[in-house]
């Protein structure tokens, strides 16, 4: 645990559409704190609606940081987010205030608490080289390369696991060290684990599924089509994270007149429900027992469960 880790932080995790943002705003008002984005898709600009970023009205209710600050033409790693959070927490005007981390990206929460190894960034040149080879040769061929260059980590990976195979090769070429060696290095915590209030929302599955459907229909009505049109106008690489946001492919198909409005909405809703299920499973299996589980944000404030850190 780092000696300068921030004490009395509030962490709010949970699947998409579970009510995290509303809870964070309520807590910010109660504590005088500020909200920090802990979601890997909400960092990207342009897609305000499809990534469910806080609305302008929400932003006016409390200070929000690290939302939409990354251009969609860029990639953004957990390590870069960690650096941005560290810089944010060091700002003079935020000292003594409660940071409220809210989002659905489990690795971000793990990094905050020091549970993620600090693997190095790799250059764009190295990254493009190995990703280009993966696209051209396939996962099985690159797994064979990894077996020769780093047999220990190759033995731990499935030959079909393209993402992890590429990552292992990138790190090996960039640093000369196996990813396994980097993973042994304990991460540095930005948030004090013992004093933090750790909350995970786990709403009723049927309720969440219905809310996801209503929310995507609202996104469509409020301008999701225009967002995707603006994104497509940038002519970006389809492999970029922003281009893989749920709804982009479906709305793009609608704009290309290869999919009806109804089918685009239905497929987006299904994809979002599947994503929420994966998030819930990750939080259930990966978060420690000291994370308190609630069905809703309202439940957090009932019965004196919420503790004002101030």
Curated annotation (Swiss-Prot):
Annotated site residues (Interaction with substrate tRNA) in this chain: 105, 127
Catalytic reactions of this protein: adenosine(37) in tRNA + dimethylallyl diphosphate = N(6)-dimethylallyladenosine(37) in tRNA + diphosphate
Binding residues for ATP: 14-21
Function: Catalyzes the transfer of a dimethylallyl group onto the adenine at position 37 in tRNAs that read codons beginning with uridine, leading to the formation of N6-(dimethylallyl)adenosine (i(6)A).
Region (Interaction with substrate tRNA), start-end ranges: 39-42, 163-167
Assembly notes: Monomer.
UniProt EC number: 2.5.1.75
Record-linked SUPFAM superfamilies: P-loop containing nucleoside triphosphate hydrolases
Keywords: ATP-binding, Magnesium, Nucleotide-binding, Transferase, tRNA processing
Cofactor: Mg(2+)
GO MF annotation list: ATP binding; tRNA dimethylallyltransferase activity
UniProt record similarity statement: Belongs to the IPP transferase family.
GO terms under biological process: tRNA modification
InterPro entries associated with the record: Dimethylallyltransferase (IPR039657), IPT (IPR018022), P-loop_NTPase (IPR027417)
Enzyme class: transferase
Pfam families listed in its UniProt record: IPPT (PF01715)
Residues the record lists as binding substrate: 16-21
The name this protein goes by in its record: tRNA dimethylallyltransferase
Source organism superkingdom: Bacteria
